[in-house]
Amino acid sequence: MTAPNGTTPAAARRDTSPPYLERGSRSYWRASVALLFAGYATFSLLYYVQPLLPEFSTTFGVSPAQSSLALSFSTGALAIAVFVAGFVSEGLSRHRLMTASLMLSSVLTLVAAFAPHWHQMLVLRALTGLALGGVPAVGMAYLAEEVHPDGLGLAMGLYVGGNAIGGMAGRVIAGVLADLFTWRIAIAAIGVLGLAATLAFRALLPPSRHFTPRRGLGFAQHRAALARHLAGRRELPVLFAMAFILMGGFVTLYNYVGYRLLAPPYSMNQATIGAIFVVYLVGVVASPWSGRMADSLGRGRVLIASVVIMLAGVALTLLQPVAAIACGIACVTFGFFAGHSTASGWVGRLATQGKGQAAALYLLSYYLGSSIVGSLGGRFWSASGWAGVAALVATLLTAGLAAAAWLRRRERSGAA
């Protein structure tokens, strides 16, 4: 049986299906810029505390390891939240869920500016992490569903580039304003900017065309989806491990470099340390670059190169000159964003079903790396100083290099 135009019914259905967002189209760029704003808000609201950790130690009388909990509580809560959000989002509007998450997390950040006690600050930071959980997994799933595969690498790169802009802006703005005024004013400013980014995101994001809410999915269906992602493709669990490794090493380095630069012989102020964090902008370049390279050279090669660049950066931070430390931080940042963009895009391509759930598993590992390794780094800092922190990160990345090499072999064999 054929359709009136001579095509088969299946072909007719394909012809009438909603079009994907083609690279270069107006809708493609609206979606990419909207997710860039979402990435900015997520990372700025999450990581602005890193340059403020020494201030928290002074104000609240806590150790560096305890101060790092201001970030670990957020990323730990976010790890749980993205895991749940990946499932919940299968039955809800992606647009509304992401907007509500960004709005609530911005408001909680404003409230945190007035927290009088350390434990209250930690509770607010944990709630912020929970609120942000509706963005990362859902954003990745939105792009994987709506963007044509030929343009997915660049779109995912721009989204991760928004993370880089947010991470840089959050750190620099918080550090400079804390030095000029107080850390409370710095936090309030971050919250206001988060609200502005949320409004821009809401106005720009095109509606979903290829997502149909699936209400009433029970635990059995979710468990089956998890089993498919963990056992169906051998590459997916390794990519989840890469997320843990990349994020764990990256966050640990940023958590404690401020303590190093505040202490002699550097004795820098917060504004100067914040200026050094401008090197975070290399992530804006790294993410789209890695997307283009992955599309042309293969994801495995880009992932290996990303880890090698991070290892070289860690080695540079062991040198004494400030310029060498800044270059090392820049290398680690470039390698991290290139690797994260590549790995996250790879997950989206390998997960043929339940993309939101696959993204949730990836981000669960990603933020657990931040929470667990980031806090563990405080013990290495207290015991061995910067050499201990660098050794921890280098060991982790060496394991990541082995995993990336295995993924490259799978890619060359055609399995991935």
Model-found features: residue ranges?
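Juxtamembrane intracellular "pre-TM" segments in multi-pass secondary transporters
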Residues: D15-S25, P206-F240
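Conserved MFS/SLC helix-loop-helix module at the cytosolic interface between two early adjacent transmembrane helices
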Residues: I80-H119
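Helix-to-loop junctions at the C-terminal end of transmembrane segments
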Residues: V82-S93, V285-G298, W381
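Helix-loop-helix hairpin linking two adjacent transmembrane segments in secondary transporters
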Residues: Q120, P149, L158-L205
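Cytoplasmic helix-loop-helix junction between adjacent transmembrane helices
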Residues: L124-I165
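C-terminal transmembrane helical hairpin of 12-TM major facilitator-type secondary transporters
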Residues: G300-A343
